[in-house]
Design a protein with these regions (language model features):
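Short amphipathic alpha-helical segments, especially helix-boundary/capping motifs
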Residues: 5-9, 19-20, 53-54, 71-72
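N-terminal helix-turn-helix DNA-binding core of bacterial DNA-binding proteins
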Residues: 14-55, 77-87
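Juxtamembrane/interface motifs at transmembrane-helix termini
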Residues: 50-53, 63, 101
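Residues within the DNA-recognition helix of helix-turn-helix
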Residues: 60
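Beta-hairpin "wing" of winged helix-turn-helix
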Residues: 65-75, 82
């Protein structure tokens, strides 16, 4: 998105589009499901549940963390990840509002 045009969109529109972009890969959706099911996970546990290399999983975790959907806390040599419930809830609200307007349901 061109920087000059970014001011033409609301903060919520920009936030939702960035989150949607982060969710636009099935591995990232799976990572969110893994974190939901396990509450917290270290990177190695997530890697064990995906058909991807550790470096690829790490890149997906970075993208999810960048938009705030997950939090990562360093514990010694490991990083422990969990869902950022505040952002997950606000994303749910943004999506519900958007689809309620679109389909008028």
């Amino acid at each position: 998105m061109a920087k000059a045009k970014i001011n033409d969109f609301t903060k919520k529109e920009i936030q939702l589009s960035e989150i949607a972009k982060a969710l636009a890969h099935p591995a990232r959706v799976r990572i969110l499901n893994i974190l939901f099911e396990n509450n917290v996970c270290i990177t190695g546990d997530i890697v064990d549940q995906l058909p991807l290399s550790q470096s690829t999983v790490s890149q997906h975790l970075i993208e999810l963390k960048k938009v705030g959907l997950i939090k990562g806390e360093i514990e010694g040599l490991k990083t422990c990840y969990c869902l950022n419930n505040k952002i997950v809830e606000s994303t749910k609200t943004l999506l519900n509002n958007l689809f309620s307007k679109i389909c008028n349901c």
